[in-house]
Regions:
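Small-residue-enriched core segments of transmembrane alpha-helices in multipass membrane transport
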Residues: 13, 39-57, 381-402
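ATP-binding catalytic core of ATPases
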Residues: 109-153, 174-189
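Membrane-embedded alpha-helical bundles of multi-pass transporters
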Residues: 68, 174, 231-233, 253, ...
Length: 416
C-alpha cells in the first residue's frame, strides 16, 4: 500500500534522526550541566520519541477496516485497492450476472425438441452461466460421446459422429462460415428486448435454430445506482448484449452511459480509455471479465462468478450484494480519514514532546533573567522546572500509542 510504504520510509529516517538527536542532546547537556543531566535528557528523548504511534497509524486502521469489511461480506484481497477506491470517479459494470441476476432462464426457442435436448446436453459440459441455464432447461438426460471444446467469448464446439456442432453467439457462427436464415434473424429480433441473450445452434454449416434467454436485474442494483448518483460518481455499463436490451437496463437504473455488443477485447479497450479520465472501478463476474478485472484500478468480483474472475478481483462480494460496493466505498473514505488523523497525531505529538524531553524549556529559561520576567513565580522559573524525566517520557509514549489505537477502533462501527 503506497501510504504504508511512505510511513515505513519516514519511520526509518525518523529513527536515525532521533538517535542522532539524542547524541547531540547528551553532548550539549554534558557540557552544560554534567553527565547526570545529559543522561536524563538523552534518555527522555529516546523514550518519548519511540515511533510506535507512527508505525501503528496505518496498519491498525487497515486491519480494523478489513475486519469491518468481512463482517459485511466483503473480502478484501488487495489492501492497496482500499486506498484507491476512495479516489474512484468511474464505476464500470458488466451486465449479465453482475447488474442482472446470475440465474438465466429460457424465454423462447425455435428448435425441435430433439435438437433442444441435444443442445442442453452439450452445454452441460460448460461452466458458463448461459450453459448452466440451458443444461437445466431440458428434462432429457442424454449421454453424449464426443469431443468438447470451449471457445471463450463465443460459445462451444462439439464433435460427435462425424458432425461438428456449434453453440454460441453470432460471431461464432460467422467465424465458422455458418449463415443464419432470415427466419432465425426475425425470431431473434422479435425477442431482443425481453430476452437479449441469444444462443445459436448449428450442425456443420447449417443453423438449426435459436434460443433466447432472459434474466432480471438484481434487486439491489437500483440502490447502488442511486448511491452513485448522490455521490456524483459516473456509472457505465459495458456489455456484450444487444443495444436495445442494454439501453433499457441503463434507463431503468439511471446509469449514465452504456456500450453494447462488446467483445472481451472491446471491454478492455473501453476500460483503458476511461482510465485516462481517472481511477476506474470495474465490477464483473465471468471468465470474459477476468482481463478487465485485472486491468482496472480497483475491481469487484461476484462470489458466484467464475474462479478466474474471483482470482482477478481486488474485492470479492461474498453475498453477491451490489450494495456492498457502496459500503466499501464509504469504508475506504473513513479508513483514510482515520489514518490521516493518526498520522497527524503522531507527528504533532513528536513535534511537541521531543523538544520538551530534550530540555529546550530549561535551556530557554537559562537565558531569562529575573528583572526581565518579574517575580519568583516568573515564566523563567516555570520553564526551568518544565522538564520530562525518563519515566514520564515513557508514559507519554504509551499514551500516544493508545490514542492512535483508540482512534482506529472507530472503524469497528457499522457505517450504515
Amino acid at each position: 500500500m503506497p501510504i504504508a510504504k511512505l510511513v515505513d520510509k519516514i519511520s526509518a529516517y525518523f529513527v536515525g534522526f532521533i538517535l542522532l538527536l539524542a547524541g547531540v542532546v547528551f553532548a550539549f547537556w554534558a557540557v552544560k550541566s554534567g553527565l547526570n543531566s545529559a543522561f536524563l535528557h538523552a534518555s527522555a528523548v529516546l523514550l518519548i520519541s519511540c515511533p510506535c504511534a507512527l508505525g501503528l497509524a496505518t496498519p491498525i486502521a487497515l486491519v480494523l477496516a478489513i475486519n469491518n469489511a468481512t463482517k459485511h461480506f466483503i473480502l478484501i484481497k488487495n489492501p492497496a485497492s482500499l486506498e484507491l477506491l476512495r479516489k474512484a470517479k468511474l464505476f464500470i459494470f458488466d451486465k449479465t450476472g453482475t447488474l442482472s441476476k446470475e440465474t438465466l432462464s429460457v424465454f423462447a426457442h425455435n428448435l425441435t425438441q430433439s435438437d433442444f435436448d441435444l443442445l442442453c446436453a452439450m452445454e452441460n459440459l460448460s461452466p458458463h452461466p448461459i450453459a448452466k441455464a440451458l443444461s437445466s432447461a431440458s428434462a432429457a438426460n442424454l449421454s453424449l460421446q464426443g469431443e468438447f471444446e470451449s471457445l471463450p467469448a463465443r460459445g462451444i464446439r462439439y464433435k460427435m459422429a462425424n458432425h461438428t456442432y456449434l453453440a454460441g453467439n453470432a460471431a461464432l457462427l460467422a467465424e465458422f462460415g455458418v449463415s443464419v436464415s432470415k427466419a432465425h434473424k426475425d425470431f431473434v429480433k422479435s425477442h431482443e428486448v425481453q430476452a437479449p441473450i441469444v444462443v445459436y445452434f448449428a450442425k456443420d454449416k447449417e443453423c438449426l435454430g435459436v434460443v433466447c434467454l432472459t434474466n432480471e436485474l438484481r434487486d439491489e442494483a437500483q440502490d447502488l445506482a442511486e448511491f452513485l448518483r448522490k455521490n456524483s460518481l459516473h456509472s457505465v455499463i459495458l456489455s456484450g448484449d444487444n443495444e436495445k436490451s442494454v439501453a433499457l437496463n441503463a434507463q431503468k437504473l439511471g446509469i449514465d452511459e452504456f456500450k453494447a455488443n462488446l467483445s472481451p477485447q472491446d471491454k478492455i479497450e473501453a476500460l483503458q480509455e476511461y482510465q485516462k479520465k481517472g481511477v476506474c472501478v470495474f465490477v464483473g463476474d465471468g471468465i470474459n471479465d477476468a482481463a478487465a478485472l485485472s486491468l482496472a484500478n480497483v475491481s469487484f468480483a461476484m462470489n458466484s462468478g467464475s474462479a478466474l474472475a474471483k482470482s482477478a478481483g481486488d474485492f470479492v462480494l461474498i453475498k453477491d450484494d451490489l450494495r456492498a460496493i457502496a459500503y466499501a466505498f464509504k469504508l475506504s473514505q473513513k479508513t483514510f480519514a482515520i489514518i490521516k488523523q493518526n498520522l497527524f497525531w503522531a507527528f504533532f505529538y513528536n513535534a511537541c514532546c521531543i523538544p520538551v524531553a530534550a530540555g529546550v524549556p530549561s535551556f530557554v529559561a537559562s537565558f531569562a533573567t529575573a528583572p526581565k520576567i518579574a517575580t519568583e513565580t516568573s515564566l523563567a522559573q516555570i520553564l526551568a522546572h518544565f522538564t520530562l524525566t525518563p519515566h514520564l517520557a515513557a508514559l507519554a509514549m504509551c499514551f500516544s500509542s493508545l490514542a492512535v489505537v483508540l482512534n482506529s477502533l472507530r472503524l469497528k462501527k457499522d457505517l450504515g
